[in-house]
Structure formats: structure tokens, C-alpha cells
């Protein structure tokens, strides 16, 4: 079973994995975020649990950077999504990004938010196809990132929150 919980220090060891060079060039590893985990920041880090074991990670960010991705002041930016290589291909990431799991997360941690945005590097077609399969839509916006042009994708929960 897949669950999303706030990242905790006891998850660090399991989340201190490496990604293939191909994957690592497109995302920050979870360990990059660990030092600031308990600091008061405009973001929250989450662990993806599979059978109660931490196997993945992502950040939801309400900081200034999100304004580059959306004009919606209530949007949150999805960052640094990854799954431990030993658990890739099992559908864990897709389950983690399902409405069933993200909706309660937004309601609890970001109650005024109804949109999740992210950037996907144009060279990362696998991730682009994955996020579309999870229900994200291409906004037709693009952004120049550190490693090249990014397509901006959005997942809108406003209809779900009002129904």
C-alpha cells in the first residue's frame, strides 16, 4: 500500500539513494533537502511509503519560485519527485500522485491551494509522459531552467474541492 507522509528524520537513511545519471540530471536527490527539513520554510517535504517503508520523496513548495510556473497565487510547486531505483516500475509514483492521495494532502497542508504545478525538462520525455498519465495538463507555458527548457504542467483540484 502507498501512503504519503511528512518526511521525518528516521526516513533519511532509506531515502539516501542514488539515481541513474540519466535521472539524476533532472531532479535533486532527497538528501539535498534534509538539512533544511525542520527549518521554517515555505515548503514541505514528503516521503512516499510503500508497505510502510520510505521509497520515494517530493517537495511541495509555496515559495516565490512557484510564481514562475503559475499566475495562480494559491498554486504549489511540486519539486524533486523521485522513487528509489529498486522500487521504480511498480506504479508507486503514479499511486502517490493520484487524486486519492494528493487531495487529502493539499486539504491538510495547503488548504487554500487547488493547483499543483511543476516543470519537466524537454529532454525528459519519460517524466513528461508519466505526469500526463497522472492527470497533469500541459499549460503551454515554458520556462528556461538550469538544465534547459521546461514544459510547465498543472494539476487542478478546484473542481474536486468544490464538489
Language model feature labels by segment:
Residues 142-163:
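Terminal substrate-recognition subdomain of acyl/acetyltransferases
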Residues 84-86, 90, 122-123:
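Active-site acidic-Proline motif in GNAT/NAT acetyltransferases
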